[in-house]
């Protein structure tokens, strides 16, 4: 017995530990739709009183029918039954109208709450540091927030609404039953407790399983994406990989189905045992009430009222405790949502951050910078120093993994260095306002985003604060050397790009890169950062664009990250990186004359391109 009490106490402690989520959830719902929330709660409260009226009127109808059965169905005898029957019909009609209205209000409220939660998730996913995207744990959190917690607040609100409605009705039913014996309400509650604790136990098991199942479920979604995405369609057919990934998908889904079925089976067996316990209590109470009726201690109306009140009360108590159990379950999942929404940013501004300069006077410097990506033991930069003079074109070359792209992320303050500092005009980036630092630069990433929008919209995204006039867009197209591409499109700048939506036109990788370049140039920032800007261009297009670029970069500071020496040779100064350090620096001819790593790599690249030594 003490062991059972301790188990019950432990389960109740788990429930109470989740109570802080309730006000936070109610605040979320209130912020999403305050008026709809109040309306829905009022409707639930009124509906909670109607069953009591129905039960009470049933007793009046039965008692008024007894004289009719004894004396005959004359108008004088039947008349007293019409009033309670009419009132019962009115109550049922009002109940139906309220249920329909509450359903409509609930549907509207649900849409508003889900959209509000989705907006919070979107805002947080944009606000958090890029470092989180290097951690698988972040994607597990995001997965649960997107596909579980996004609708759980509404479910919890429904649980609380059901608890309110059932509590009101149950209190009234208890008041009705008290006249027949104080022990009846206690028996009613006791009969539902086994099912309640079964529900709590299995909801906790389900939640723990969901935590463990997040990674396999995400893997199944990945296989699903591989099998259905446009990006993978050609290679899956060429390499005949469809059956392989279908088999991998089925293996993961089979594992998840088996685990879920076992949970459902265990819960079903436990619920059956709990129902048997409740049935014994119900049978005992019913036999006691029938015995009292046979002893003429209660009327037939009382017996009818008892059966209705006890059965409904038992159902209400069970529903109330089930709502508590569901609220417990939903609160467990809401912990994931609130944990996701509480993620801290590490790239933060100082309390009195300095404004970033509108233009560079001295330049950019990396001073003994060391950095490794979150969750990685590999050092990306080690004691790295580099100077980029204002108004110059600087190229950084090196092997894949040398740390070139890491420079871009640190300079844009997407990450902060573990040691050392990145400075603009001698001021550490961490002392400046983050948004203003990022306004200083325009970046072409190594893998630019292919937005499913029109050409003009794609380019205008480079600077939404600027006026997206036709002249501005045309200038950016010209600077990127994309005039011919846009001219060939069916509707020019108004052509929808990509195949996500009907009527879209797809581009080659090189053409997409030109559109991304135009987007970068549309942002009139004093610092231009280009990460592999010509990687998808043929040699003729590369030479044409590089000739234009020297003109475009005048009075601006440019940093080019590249593995193509034909691109690097146009820079004022070239830095060669290897294993997170600069190993050579100089102009193109100067580095060739040194005969070091740059000269050796240049010769290899020229021979590979068939251009001689």
What are these regions (language model features)?
Residues 31-34, 146-156, 208, 212-215, ...:
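An intracellular "coupling" helix at the cytosolic face of ABC transporter transmembrane type-1 domains
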Residues 1-51, 69-84, 102-106, 123, ...:
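Membrane-integrated ABC transporters
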Residues 355-613:
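ABC-type nucleotide-binding domain
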Residues 38-98, 174-206, 280-307:
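Transmembrane helix-loop-helix hairpins at lipid-water interfaces of multipass membrane proteins
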Residues 241, 285, 303-343:
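Cytosolic ends of transmembrane helices, especially the final helix of ABC transmembrane type-1 domains
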Residues 130, 343-346, 479-486:
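Hydrophobic patch in the ABC ATPase nucleotide-binding domain
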Residues 22, 55-62, 118-122, 135, ...:
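Alpha-helical transmembrane segments of polytopic integral membrane proteins
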Residues 1-23, 111-154, 216-259, 331-344, ...:
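Extended non-transmembrane interhelical loops and adjacent amphipathic helices
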């Amino acid at each position: 017995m003490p062991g059972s009490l301790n188990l019950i106490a432990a389960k109740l402690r788990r429930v109470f530990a989740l109570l802080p989520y309730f006000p936070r959830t109610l605040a979320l719902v209130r912020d999403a739709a305050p008026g709809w929330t109040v309306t829905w709660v009022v409707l639930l409260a009124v509906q909670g009183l109607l069953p009591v009226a129905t039960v009470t009127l049933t007793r009046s109808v039965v008692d008024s029918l007894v004289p009719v059965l004894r004396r005959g169905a004359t108008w004088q005898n039947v008349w007293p039954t019409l009033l309670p029957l009419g009132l019962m019909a009115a109550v049922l009609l009002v109940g139906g109208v309220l249920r329909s209205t509450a359903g409509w209000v609930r549907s509207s409220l649900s849409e508003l709450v889900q959209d509000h939660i989705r907006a919070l998730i979107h805002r947080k996913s944009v606000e958090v540091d890029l470092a989180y995207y290097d951690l698988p744990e972040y994607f597990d959190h995001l997965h649960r927030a997107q596909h579980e917690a996004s609708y759980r607040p509404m479910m919890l609100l429904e649980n609380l609404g059901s608890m309110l409605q059932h509590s009101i009705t149950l209190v009234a039913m208890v008041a009705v039953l008290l006249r027949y014996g104080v022990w009846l309400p206690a028996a009613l509650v006791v009969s539902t407790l086994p099912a309640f604790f079964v529900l709590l136990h299995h909801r906790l098991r389900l939640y723990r399983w969901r935590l463990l199942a997040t990674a396999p479920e995400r893997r199944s979604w990945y296989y699903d994406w591989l099998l259905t995405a446009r990006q993978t369609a050609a290679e899956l057919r060429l390499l005949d990989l469809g059956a392989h990934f279908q088999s991998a998908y089925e293996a993961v889904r089979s594992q998840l189905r088996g685990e879920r079925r076992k949970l459902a089976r265990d819960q079903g067996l436990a619920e059956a045992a709990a129902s048997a316990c409740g049935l014994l209590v119900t049978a005992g109470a019913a036999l006691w009430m029938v015995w009292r009726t046979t002893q003429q201690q209660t009327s037939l109306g009382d017996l009818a009222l008892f059966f209705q009140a006890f059965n409904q009360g038992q159902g209400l108590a069970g529903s109330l405790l089930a709502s508590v159990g569901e609220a417990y379950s939903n609160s467990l999942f809401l912990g994931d949502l609130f944990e996701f929404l509480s993620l801290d940013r590490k790239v933060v501004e100082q309390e009195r951050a300095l404004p970033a300069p509108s233009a560079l006077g001295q330049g950019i410097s990396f001073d003994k910078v060391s950095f490794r990506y979150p969750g990685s033991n590999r050092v990306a930069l080690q004691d790295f120093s580099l100077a980029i003079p204002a108004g110059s074109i600087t190229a950084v070359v090196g092997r894949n993994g040398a740390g070139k792209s890491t420079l871009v992320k640190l300079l844009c303050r997407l990450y902060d260095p573990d040691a050392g500092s990145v400075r603009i005009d001698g001021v550490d980036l961490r002392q400046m306002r983050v948004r203003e630092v990022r306004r200083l630069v325009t970046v072409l990433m190594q893998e630019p985003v292919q937005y499913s929008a029109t050409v003009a919209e794609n380019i205008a995204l480079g600077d939404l604060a600027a006026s997206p006039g036709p002249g501005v867009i045309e200038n950016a197209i010209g600077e990127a050397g994309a005039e011919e591409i846009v001219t060939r499109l069916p509707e020019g700048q108004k052509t929808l790009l990509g195949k996500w939506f009907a009527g879209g036109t797809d581009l080659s990788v090189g053409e997409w890169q030109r559109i991304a370049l135009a987007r970068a140039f549309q942002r009139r920032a004093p610092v231009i950062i280009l990460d592999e800007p010509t990687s998808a261009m043929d040699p003729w297009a590369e030479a044409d664009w590089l000739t234009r670029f020297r003109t475009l970069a005048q009075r601006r500071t440019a940093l080019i990250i590249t593995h193509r020496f034909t691109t690097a040779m146009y820079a004022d100064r070239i830095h060669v990186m290897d294993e997170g350090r600069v190993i050579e620096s100089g102009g193109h001819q100067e580095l060739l004359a040194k005969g070091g790593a740059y000269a050796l790599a240049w010769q290899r690249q020229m021979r590979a391109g068939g251009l001689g030594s």
